[in-house]
Swiss-Prot record:
Its cofactor is Mg(2+). The gene is acpS. It is found in: Cytoplasm. Transmembrane segments: none annotated. Keywords: Cytoplasm, Fatty acid biosynthesis, Fatty acid metabolism, Lipid biosynthesis, Lipid metabolism, Magnesium, Metal-binding, Transferase. This is Holo-[acyl-carrier-protein] synthase.
Length: 130
């Protein structure tokens, strides 16, 4: 069938770092234990690491929303936590879905690319039905 959705997101790393450091923030709860663990291993660049993963989560939502053009938006509660970025042994990212979004995207292959350079983290997501 082909490409059914494309999403892109840019994150200001300094702004992201400020949000994450706010007292009482629940911002970190949107990251899975695995994502937080992976970031803690990269202590000098943990914020960059998480900012790029936030960009992936947002890009997945945008791609999914775009694939539902002219249909009512569906944003399940805690959707960000249901989108997890995992890496293979060589560090290549992949998206793992759980919860309601996984049920909606069962037949979809998710392609992801993420980067961070300077003060910006970015991600591109392509949803493809084979």
């Amino acid at each position: 069938m082909g490409i059914v959705g494309v999403g892109i997101d840019l994150v200001s790393i300094p702004d992201f770092a400020e949000q994450v450091s706010q007292p009482g923030t629940v911002f970190m709860t949107i990251f899975t234990p695995g994502e937080r663990r992976d970031a803690s291993v990269k202590s000098s660049s943990a914020v960059c690491h998480l900012a790029a993963r936030w960009a992936v989560k947002e890009a997945v939502i945008k791609a999914w929303s775009g694939s539902r053009f002219a249909q009512r938006p569906m944003l399940p509660e805690n959707i960000h936590r249901d989108i997890e970025v995992v890496n293979d042994m060589w560090g290549r990212p992949r998206v793992r879905l759980t919860g309601a979004i996984a049920k909606h995207l069962t037949d979809v292959t998710i392609h992801v690319s993420l980067t961070h350079e300077g003060d910006i983290a970015a991600a591109v997501v392509i949803l493809e039905v084979l």
